[in-house]
């Protein structure tokens, strides 16, 4: 057994020397396999090669460690060495690998190559068992705790506890103070997350590393030199003479719309720019309290902000100087540069509401017909209503004429009314007025206008009195005839002349003439049906009314004859109208 151990040791020494490994015929696996005779025959060359290069080996100093990854050949050699030594003597196992230590071999076997190692996710039973064991042994004896968890090593249990199971771990969102502390600690320690975790209680090194790499490292460019991570809000006090205003981010004036900047040697140019629309409070330099000459400016205005920004030391160092500050703006002058040129900026404050309205009125008179003023809702008056005729044509006419602006085309802009209406009109009255004046209302829907000024006596209610009735047609007012069928054919006559004499109402194209005539024929047929259905009732009522008003002496026996006669006349008239319409459609 002693000879066998000596041969194995010599084989491992040979593997530690690259020159011996290339010259010797003994393979790495020869020391773990084969019979004793084979090893005995190969032992003399191994010992001679080891003695020949023993002087090249270092006898002192630290052991060189391989920094590269493990190759498949090294993994296979490690498996055989662990199997030979039963995984107990790691110092002898490490002697079989050049530039590998026993710690490297042990970790490689425990973390990677061990077939009993569990690399999957943690189960709830394992987490509960770790929590119970930590309560019993404390968060230090991880090798003892790992023995209770088959397939897990002490390092896995420790990382599971410190990164996930520890109740002191903070899993909420990162605060501003924590991020600022992380930035400061990273400047000191770099990527030493365990050291940084000591500065941030409740945050694990793993969570710190993830938060830094995911989001916080990208925000470093936005931090200023004063290490203020979050831009403070603008604080505006009532009296800025006593308390300074905290402005955000020391830098330059951020003007979204660049002002017009001209040099002083160019006369005749206006140095104006509106500062109310492009001043950005979030990017003004850190300002100092203003002097007494700027104290008259209104607090919180845009001019105040610009004046404070230009009074700061960072801006004064660039040769900028405030020439004058007033309520409507300020003037900034620059020192001459190396070329001898300087420039001036005049920043004007936003005008008040009254000044803006006055300027708009002045511009309206100067622009002439190019200006249009939008009327208010309470000033809009329905043109078609007759109730507003006095309001539009009364005393206000002279006032409106003074405000009207004639355009080159002869059109005028309607001026707004000077005052509101004194009488509030109801919705019904406005709708009725609009309906009566609507030109597209069909005449069949219009009511007959009756003279209701004086009551009609019973003696005047005769058939001849019906001549005072009127109905609307496209040709104008038409008198009503005394016959009952005239009332039934009123809507038919209101459709217009059938001979085509009136051309002003026919706006349809010629290809639609037939369809229009067919629709007219259908309308007449419907009216004939309606007239024949209500002929008896309507005719009897008119007949009785005329007989009673004229005090006729017709007897009861003559009434049926008169009724038949009137019925025949009505049918004849309606038949003529229908025949005329049919002939028109055929033509």
UniProtKB/Swiss-Prot annotation:
It is found in: Nucleus. The gene is MYB3R-2. Expressed in roots, leaves, stems and spikes. GO terms for molecular function: DNA-binding transcription factor activity, RNA polymerase II-specific; RNA polymerase II cis-regulatory region sequence-specific DNA binding; sequence-specific DNA binding. This is Transcription factor MYB3R-2. Residues 43-54 have a biased composition (Low complexity). InterPro entries: Homeodomain-like_sf, Myb_dom, MYB_TF, SANT/Myb, SANT_dom. It comes from Oryza sativa subsp. japonica. PANTHER family: MYB PROTEIN-RELATED. Induction: Induced by cold, drought and salt stresses. It holds the Pfam family Myb_DNA-binding. Residues 62-113, 114-169, 170-220 form the HTH myb-type domain. Plants over-expressing MYB3R-2 show increased tolerance to freezing. Plants over-expressing MYB3R-2 show retarded growth, increased tolerance to cold, drought and salt stresses, and have decreased sensitivity to seed germination inhibition by abscisic acid (ABA) or salt. The keyword DNA repair does not apply. One of its GO terms (cellular component) is nucleus. GO terms for biological process: positive regulation of DNA-templated transcription; positive regulation of response to salt stress; positive regulation of response to water deprivation; regulation of DNA-templated transcription; response to cold. Its main location: nucleus. Residues 14-74, 441-461 are annotated as: Disordered. Transcription factor involved in abiotic stress responses. May play a regulatory role in tolerance to salt, cold, and drought stresses. Transcriptional activator that binds specifically to a mitosis-specific activator cis-element 5'-(T/C)C(T/C)AACGG(T/C)(T/C)A-3', found in promoters of cyclin genes such as CYCB1-1 and KNOLLE (AC Q84R43). Positively regulates a subset of G2/M phase-specific genes, including CYCB1-1, CYCB2-1, CYCB2-2, and CDC20.1 in response to cold treatment. Residues 90-113, 142-165, 193-216 bind DNA. Coiled coil: none annotated. Keywords: DNA-binding, Nucleus, Repeat, Stress response, Transcription, Transcription regulation.
